[in-house]
Swiss-Prot record:
Pfam families: BRCT, DNA_ligase_aden, DNA_ligase_OB, DNA_ligase_ZBD, HHH_2, HHH_5, Nlig-Ia
Entry's EC annotation: 6.5.1.2
Protein name per Swiss-Prot or TrEMBL: DNA ligase
Domain of life: Bacteria
Domain BRCT, first and last residues per copy: 596-681
GO biological process, one term: DNA replication
Keyword Coiled coil belongs to the record: no
Organism in which the protein naturally occurs: Pectobacterium atrosepticum (strain SCRI 1043 / ATCC BAA-672) (Erwinia carotovora subsp. atroseptica)
NCBIfam families linked: dnlj (TIGR00575), PRK07956.1 (NF005932)
């Protein structure tokens, strides 16, 4: 066997291994970009040496075999994948090939869509009813996931409208948005459950649950992008019009779709999406470009594993391989000690990455990470870079275990890890310089006291020069002291003093949030303020009283009581609010007495879920609260009502499971109109 044949055999072996890891085990070992490079190399070798092409080559089929745990489903129309291009030159070559075949390349209309990073599925509707859902599998045979798909709120169980075919197979992508993914992992860390590396793995793992009740709790959503089988009916003759028809039937379709004439407009769309992808709220890895005319698609036909009339125009890689050179430990405002990996610098999604958070000891154990490992680093949009896997096959003999410190790396205080929690914390409190800095940065942040111009570097200097130890010290600073800071002139110093004075006028909710009570975010702070109305009432509240507040459970109640009972914190709060001293103040909070309100929401714990189209989420919360409702962020047995907007997901499913009444936005608006001031509606 010659050198080329040996390389072809090796590439096939490696690609098959990674196909199995990716498609079957949902545990990819290498980034997509590395897999794509290997596939491109094999394609090139087979193109140069066609005598080496075999029917079982990875270039001749779509993916790997499905798991046997689910019933297998044979696709009546194969689910093919797309060929990829990775730069503008390659895309233009694709466009030219099509233009040459059709003799009208510059005038050709393309339908451009987002390339979603989730799990491809097919949905079979008969007489408008969802009867079967399946994964792609190997393109010919997939897995029957109907029971799980039925739990995804974005997917209609019945199509609505006219001209619905007798049988139609809709194809699309199930994925998870960033917000839902982060909440899922937060809950997993809190309970010691499995933490997912990225939203794609979370979506795939959620659909492969044998128990649909687990899938129902996962924040999955769906966009459709094509059709497979079609019997007993007709669809429009353009891809764009088909998507619009799907939308009319109640199927979710992305609003980031554009018809482009010629390659120049396609490139403009690609660049625009690449620049704005971080604001989408979910992962994409490129743009899919399809010839819009179905007649022209038919003329162009297919190659072995992909259509000639479409291509995936991929973005620069968001995952890359690099080495862990060291691990250091940082201390946050609540004392949480976070391990940070120092990496061999590598370009990921156009940014040089040299650090990645490791979260906690459990995450290090889950990854099996050691210093010196070869790792996969991911950076998506503005998300902090993270290590999502290691390449065990490249682990050197010189690796060293990562050992958590027994004492705080900043102040030397003892560290502790409370049973049932994933986080290790410094016990030094505000004697720890790191905690002091982070607590002060939080106090002046935009969503807290909002001290304009008081940036992180200024706080660092104030603490290091020992000008400031508590939040109260900030308001004692003079312009003269400020001018002693780096890059701080008299005018800037005076502006900061004025900003601190302005920040004294705030709200009780902002003040409570600014204090940095553990696990008390903006929403919980607002609920505490609305429920108790004053600091005095909050200080007097026992655990039972705190548990009456929406979103406050036993753990949060304990954190609030512990913070308010701590003598140092009481001193700081007195200093900050003393009318004869610093005098931070806020308007009186009117506490709503549900018993005095004639409203269907009075005294009810209400949860909002999904997207609202008439009111904003904040407007809805304000209106509901004004009518006596307690607006909570999570569904539990204490929930009295769920208001479900569009694309409601796991909260709606949980409400249905618990038998909690559910109304839609229109019904909420009707009730608000009947029982409140309609001028704001």
């Amino acid at each position: 066997m010659n050198a080329v044949a040996l390389r072809v055999a090796e590439l096939r072996r490696v690609l098959r291994h990674h196909e199995y890891k990716y498609h079957v085990e949902d545990a990819p070992e290498i980034p997509d970009i590395e897999y794509d490079k290997l596939m491109q190399e094999l394609k090139a070798l087979e193109a140069d040496h066609p005598e080496l092409v075999t029917s079982d080559s990875p270039t001749q089929r779509v993916g790997a075999a499905p798991l046997a745990a689910f019933e297998q489903v044979r696709h009546e129309v194969p689910m093919l994948s797309l060929d990829n291009v990775f730069d503008e030159e390659s895309y233009l070559a694709f466009s030219k090939r099509i233009g040459d075949r059709l003799k009208n390349g510059d005038d050709l209309t393309f339908c451009c869509e987002l390339k979603l990073d989730g799990l491809a599925v097919s949905l079979l509707y008969e007489e408008g009813i969802l009867v079967q859902a399946a994964t792609r599998g190997d393109g010919t045979t997939g897995e029957n996931i109907t029971s799980n798909i039925r739990t995804v709120g974005a997917i209609p169980l019945r199509l609505e409208g006219e001209n619905i075919p007798r049988r139609v197979e809709v194809r699309g992508e199930v994925f998870m948005k960033h917000g839902g993914f982060e909440k899922l992992n937060e809950e997993a860390r809190r309970t010691g459950s499995k933490v997912f590396a990225n939203p794609r793995n979370a979506a795939a793992g959620s659909l492969r649950q044998l128990d649909p009740r687990i899938t129902a709790k996962r924040p999955l959503t769906f966009f459709c992008y094509g059709v497979g089988l079609l019997e007993g009916g007709e669809l429009p003759a353009s891809h764009w019009e088909r998507l619009m028809q799907f939308k009319a039937w109640g199927l979710p379709v992305s609003d980031r779709i554009k018809l482009c004439t010629g390659p120049a407009e396609v490139l403009d769309f690609y660049r625009q999406v690449e620049q704005t992808r971080s604001s989408l709220g979910f992962d994409i890895d490129g743009v899919v470009v399809k010839v819009d005319s179905l007649a022209l698609q038919e003329r162009l036909g297919f190659v072995a594993r992909a259509p000639r009339w479409a291509v995936a125009f991929k973005f620069p890689a968001q995952e890359q391989l690099t080495w862990v050179r060291d691990v250091e430990f940082q201390v946050g405002r609540t004392g949480a000690i976070t391990p940070v990996a120092r990496l061999e610098p590598v370009a990921v999604a156009g940014v040089i990455v040299s650090n990645a958070t490791l979260h906690n000891a459990d995450e290090i154990e889950r990854l099996g990470l050691q210093i010196g490992d070869r790792v996969i680093v991911r950076r998506a949009g503005d998300v902090i870079p993270q290590i999502v896997g290691i390449v065990e096959s490249e682990r050197p003999e010189t690796v060293q275990p990562i050992v958590f410190p027994a004492a705080c790396p900043v102040c030397g205080s003892d560290v502790e890890r409370v049973e049932g929690e994933a986080v290790t914390r410094c016990t030094g409190g505000l004697i720890c310089g790191a905690q002091r800095k982070e607590a002060l940065k939080h106090f002046v942040s935009r969503r807290a006291l909002d001290v304009e111009g008081m940036g992180d570097k200024i706080i660092d200097q104030l603490v290091e020069k020992e000008y400031v130890k508590t939040p109260a010290d900030l308001f004692r600073l003079s312009a003269g002291i400020m001018t002693g800071l780096d890059r701080m002139g008299p005018k800037s110093a005076m502006n900061l003093v004025n900003a601190l004075e302005k920040a004294k006028s705030t709200t009780l909710a902002r003040f409570l949030y600014a204090l940095g009570i553990r696990d008390v975010g903006e929403s919980t702070a607002a609920n505490l303020a609305a429920h108790f109305g004053s600091l005095e009432t909050l200080f007097a509240a026992d655990e039972d009283a705190l548990l009456e507040v929406p979103d406050v459970g036993k753990i949060v109640a304990a954190h609030v009581r512990h913070f308010l009972e701590e003598e140092h914190n009481q001193t700081v709060i007195r200093e900050l609010t003393d009318p004869a001293g610093i005098n931070i103040y806020w308007p009186e909070v009117k506490v709503v007495n549900a018993e005095e309100i004639d409203s269907p929401f009075a005294g009810k714990t209400v949860v909002l879920t999904g997207s609202l189209s008439i009111l904003s989420r904040d407007e809805a919360k304000d209106r509901l609260t004004a009518l006596g409702a307690k607006v909570s962020g999570s569904v539990s047995k204490k929930t009295d009502m769920v208001i479900a907007g569009e694309a409601a997901g796991s909260k709606l499913a949980k409400a249905q499971e618990l038998g909690i009444p559910v109304i839609d936005e229109a019904e909420m608006i009707r009730l608000l109109n009947n029982h409140g001031d309609v001028s704001t509606l």
